């Protein structure tokens, strides 16, 4: 059964046990004021998780301010975060409040922090110690909860270690869509109803959606469904009607071709035990059974070979 929630104007839908567990962690962590590091691929829902953390927290009535660090030159990071005063600059700029001040008593979400240069990242880390207005000797401390997100495991670990040296910090990992296939149908049907409530998926179309690896995650699924619905000519979307991203399928197909072999290996390693094999692959038993049927894998023959 899919769950649907709204967090600060952003809709979130999930049906998989992994996302249920993740949002249970979100509700628990939201009650504290601890900084949070989010690790998740592009399009996996990092902003949704950040907004949910703010929504469930006591800071909910206060501002939620977000900044995409990857779109900002390193030399502007400090001015954006701390603000500036014209007395500290040679150019005739007026005084401007920084994002830390704007987010006072609320939440500051720093997305794509892994794309920052080391020097800029070091400046950001200073915000966890003290915040000040650029050009002022006097320091003014801000009461802000900071959530930092990245798609790079190494960046997440580096940031987590750096923050842990200063204070307790939480780390949340957002699973990619390919590791929670139970969410594909719920999300796809939702996106389709948004675009055209009269359209439905044929069984073959849903099979095609399940077989795709979704390197762009939920964002790519949404764009694929909307694009396919716009060009649909009938009441049903069939497998041939699904318009996958033209930039990705070749690479994706190469990875997808490895999946049957990975499943066979997991079954062999687990002695044919589906639950153990599913756990090793990071998916549910239901998802594994569906993939076995899709690829036409003969598990009986495989188990007999293992036992021989």
Model-derived regions, located:
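Bacterial C-terminal helix-turn-helix
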Residues: 36, 45, 51, 223, ...
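Short gly/ser/thr-rich secondary-structure transition/capping motifs
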Residues: 87-94, 126-134
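Conserved AAA+/SF3 P-loop NTPase catalytic/coupling segment centered on the Walker-B
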Residues: 36-37, 48, 52, 74-79, ...
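Residue-level marker of regulatory loop/turn positions in helix-turn-helix DNA-binding domains and
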Residues: 11, 92, 138, 255-256, ...
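Nucleotide-binding/hydrolysis machinery
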Residues: 2-20, 24-31, 41, 50, ...
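N-terminal positioning helix adjacent to the helix-turn-helix/winged-helix DNA-binding module
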Residues: 18, 95, 258-262
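AAA+/P-loop NTPase substrate/partner-engagement loops
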Residues: 59-80
């Amino acid at each position: 059964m899919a769950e649907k929630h709204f967090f600060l104007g952003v809709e979130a839908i999930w049906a998989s046990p992994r996302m249920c567990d993740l949002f249970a962690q979100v509700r628990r962590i939201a009650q504290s004021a601890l900084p949070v590091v989010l690790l998740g691929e592009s399009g996996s829902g990092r902003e949704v998780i950040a907004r949910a953390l703010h929504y469930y927290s006591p800071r909910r009535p206060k501002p939620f301010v977000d900044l995409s660090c990857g779109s900002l030159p390193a030399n502007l990071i400090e001015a954006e975060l701390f603000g500036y005063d014209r007395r500290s600059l040679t150019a005739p700029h007026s005084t401007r409040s920084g994002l830390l001040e704007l987010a006072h008593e609320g939440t500051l979400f720093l997305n794509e922090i892994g794309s920052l240069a080391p020097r800029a990242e070091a400046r950001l880390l200073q915000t966890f110690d003290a915040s000040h207005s650029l050009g002022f000797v006097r320091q003014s401390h801000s009461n802000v909860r900071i959530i930092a997100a990245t798609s790079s495991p190494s960046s997440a670990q580096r940031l987590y270690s750096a923050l842990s040296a200063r204070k307790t910090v939480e780390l949340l990992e957002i699973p990619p869509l390919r590791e929670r296939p139970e969410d594909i149908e719920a999300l796809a049907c939702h996106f389709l109803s948004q675009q055209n409530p009269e359209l439905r998926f044929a069984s073959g179309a849903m099979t095609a959606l399940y077989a795709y690896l979704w390197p762009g995650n939920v964002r790519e699924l949404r764009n694929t469904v909307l694009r396919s619905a716009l060009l649909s000519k009938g009441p049903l979307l069939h497998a041939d009607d699904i318009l996958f991203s033209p930039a990705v399928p070749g690479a994706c197909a190469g990875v997808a071709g490895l999946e049957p072999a990975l499943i066979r290996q997991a079954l062999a390693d687990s002695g044919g035990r589906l639950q153990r094999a599913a756990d090793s692959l990071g998916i549910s038993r239901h998802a594994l059974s569906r993939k076995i049927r899709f690829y036409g894998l003969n598990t009986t023959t495989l188990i007999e070979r293992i036992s021989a």
